[in-house]
Amino acid sequence: QILKRDQVNYVPHLDVEHKDAESLILPSAVAVVGVRGEDIQYRFGYEANRLFHLSYIDEGFCVFYDLKRWVGDADRLEEVVDREGHRSFVPRKEIIRAYLEYVIECARQRFKCSFKSIHISAPVKQKPLFVELFQELLPEYRLESENMLDEGVAVLYNTISTLIKEKQYQDGAIYRALIIDCGAGTTDLSSCRFRITD
């Protein structure tokens, strides 16, 4: 069984630019590979990066990065162009939705299960905006909003999880952390103390 109860479970992604090496990080990149009227075909993550690098050799790929920056202006239209020159205009939120659905589908395939609830971290100052948009984009899921982690705290929890997993902590010792979260045009700085007990 791939899905392990009471543990952090990761979805590895194949980095097609590095001989299909597994990576736990997926680039927030979306490439447009087909435009047929309202029907837009996308590629995501490493495949989008690969197509972006090909576009320097073979013009015609439309690739988007920094999707998180779009949350504040999600209704804005983006022009999409495929390799054959077909064009259309798509709201940014539709591109974001396609990316999120891809990420969820990767997890569904990996763990062979369906999801009813999801948690998406967000920049601390933009949580309400992210919650509102993601609830609109993914109405079929219950989005954790009341206890939604900001991105900096999510990174800290991941670090604590690694300390526990690798037994790299002293039981009961007080640790201090400085969290510097840079992204999407803002930098958040916070500090905390925490203790791990068995």
What are these regions (language model features)?
Residues 32-36, 72-82, 154-166, 191-198:
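Short regulatory "switch" loops immediately downstream of catalytic or recognition motifs
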Residues 71, 122-126, 152-156, 181-186, ...:
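Short, flexible loop/turn elements at secondary-structure junctions
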Residues 105-114, 124, 130, 134-176, ...:
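Hydrophobic, small-residue-rich alpha-helical packing segments that form membrane-like cores
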